[in-house]
Amino acid sequence: MKKDIKHIFWMLLCLLTIVACSDENHEMLITGPEIPELDHEPSIEELVEGINNYPTKFKGDKQGKIWYKAAAGDDLYGYEGDVYVHIGINDWMYVPTEWGVNEDKYKAEKVADNIWCFTLAPTVREWFGAENAANIQNVCILFRNDEALTDEKKTSDFFITVTGDKTFTPAPVEIAACPVEEAGIHPSADGTSVTFALYDLDTDNNYKDYACLIGDFNDWELSTEYQMKRDNDKHFWWYTVTGIDPAKEYGFQYYMGSEKDGNVRIGDPYCEKVLDGSNDKYLVEQGVYPASAIQYPNGKTTGIVSVFQTKPASYNWQVSDFKIDNPDNMVIYELLFRDFTQTGSELATGTIKEATKHLDYIKSLGVNAIELMPIQEFDGNNSWGYNPCYYFAMDKAYGTKEEYKQFIDECHKQGIAVLLDVVYNHATGSHPFAKLYWNSKESKTAKNNPWFNVDAPHPFSVFHDFNHESPLVREFVKRNLKFLLEEYKFDGFRFDLTKGFTQNKSNESTASNKDDSRIVILKDYYKTVNTTNPNAVMILEHFCNLDEESELAKAGMKLWHNMNESYCQSGMGESSNSDFSYMRNSGMPAEGWVNFMESHDEERVAYKQTAFGNLQNASLDIRMKQLGTNAAFFLTVPGPKMIWQFGELGYDYSIMYKYDGTMGTEKNTDAKPVKWDYLTDQYRKGLYDTYSTLLKLRNDNPDLFSDNAFKDWKVSVSDWDKGRYLRLESTTKKLVVVGNFKNEQINTGVYFGNTGDWYELNGETLNVTNSSEQPVVIPANSFKLYTNFPVNN
């Protein structure tokens, strides 16, 4: 960065604040209601309605006094109970208590009707215990009633300026070569020191004026002692911290400033664990995150904190060489930890530990892969996970790093691959790269941000759109993919919204058109996946035109293929739009599409049965049989398949169902009821058994379910009345499925190809005497599956 005398003079003399505003990504002065100027301590008669304080501007090393006078209509006007303050400094740092705690230290003195007084003594700093805080810019305070947890009455937030306090003046930047080659956290061999390296160069070839480390190793105090050095060749800020205890976890942040952009504190984008002051406490209460582990440094900083440990305990993998069996024909179980299990009576409390206990259930079902919805650190605790902010850290909402590894290890023991849903199209404003160059006025990434677009060039983005043409983004994504494959032993990925991996502008009508640049980007990522683990799979949520999807499939990738409408229609007993033949296309390799009847994003077939179509008033028995017939014309089709969790039990809560138990008008990400009690219902258990039987047949006879074995099917709308039909034939084995989706029995003629004994799944035998058109009776809402060999169920 080119520095002139003006910049250097400013850097040496400016007084920099330390507090971060929660609504912005950059640090700034917080303002509140205007407070009257006072040159003396006011009498009760001089107090105005609202907030009053003396002195008008506090000093950190002096006493401060605050009065609140309630106006008619205020929550506390006429209130006779005790009044307490909720108080902090800067952006609610050093808040001494949780909301609603009634202790004498926070109790305001009632000095007259509707007037309360609170004193910070002996000094502002000493009252807060903030003697070492680098700078106090303001005191934030509100007054509340003593029943705030049950019947809240409170004032608005007030902010009182603090002047003449400690300041920080950065030293001139030292230019020095960085001893490490990659950005991130680099422990020494003995673990007693660690080098931090942070990339910083914007699209205008400028960088921040200075960077400092703050953390547990320096009690979060901003000082020139921990000011980072600059390597202009690597574009790194870097610093080596010594005196580290290898067995201890440390929290830290980068604190950076510039005359142009102000100040910002960020975590390390490559850290493997973070602390969140707004959300972690709930995980501790729930027992998901250990109370004995490192906790957020409340009162000492704001924003997400990165964690490092130079010599962490290593996980002892029981299975180190797992490989997916037949990835081109795998059956995947899409799973959201949050809604798969439940702790107590509360929704959204699913954990890794509880999910691990149900692996026998998944194994018995017959799937050979689990696809986890996003688990990389996301904003908040309750989410689908498509709001990522730290890609190398697994979210603590579901458990610890070790528990994630244990889950994957246990899956591998059961012969189940684990795929991870990754979200590289976008990130939230909490991501360090977003915060580093941020437009506070518009709440967007700034124009000079080298990782993000200001606005997405495509119409489907949310949050902040990554620029995948940027070498920095490509390097980051590929490094993350390699890390996930090696550190956690994931067996592959499902990439979210890959249609957005382009810089070519488009609208809803053109975004699906073939985009050669997008193909190049995805092939580049696939090369990293394939080089790291040749057996790993890469699935795309792409939904583009066939010419592009076909090219990606021929390169080795797989693509989501949505069959929800067709199977919802057949599940409801409606023939219109129920054509299954779209599952296959001569222009697409059979292993290229991962077909699904349901996904996290689509409506549940069993719910639509209850709300629309010809089965609204049908018994549960009939509805589950219809869903079993759906499964028979889904799981027998060659090529990869995916099941959404609990679809095998006929889960019939709508995607529009809301957390409060009401029905919304559009799909939402609210937690849904966890219905393990479905297993005790004979009809739902019967559907599970149908899935399990079909999958066992598929797993035991891989040659019969290969693409080469596919011979014929009649699954269009015109085949509805006389029954749908599918035929597979390998070298020695044959299979025929006939299905009736109507509410009445049908008599039909079936092509078997040869006469003789054919075997049903239930063990019964059919003697076929007419190989071209054998008469078969199919009960309503049912299917029959025949093989030319006995099936062992």
Model-predicted segments: where are they?
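Bacterial Sec-dependent N-terminal signal peptides
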Residues: I18-I51, V173, C178
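Active-site-proximal helices and loops of the catalytic beta/alpha 8
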Residues: K229, P374-Q376, W384-N387, H412-Q414, ...
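C-terminal beta-strand-rich structural cap/linker in extracellular carbohydrate-active enzymes
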Residues: N770-N793
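Bacterial N-terminal signal peptides
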Residues: W10-I18
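Bacterial N-terminal signal peptides that target proteins for export
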Residues: K2-F9
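Aromatic-rich carbohydrate-binding modules that target alpha-glucans
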Residues: L76-A133, D146-I160, S193-E249, G257-D280
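Substrate-binding/active-site clefts of carbohydrate-active enzymes
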Residues: C271, L275, K281, E285, ...
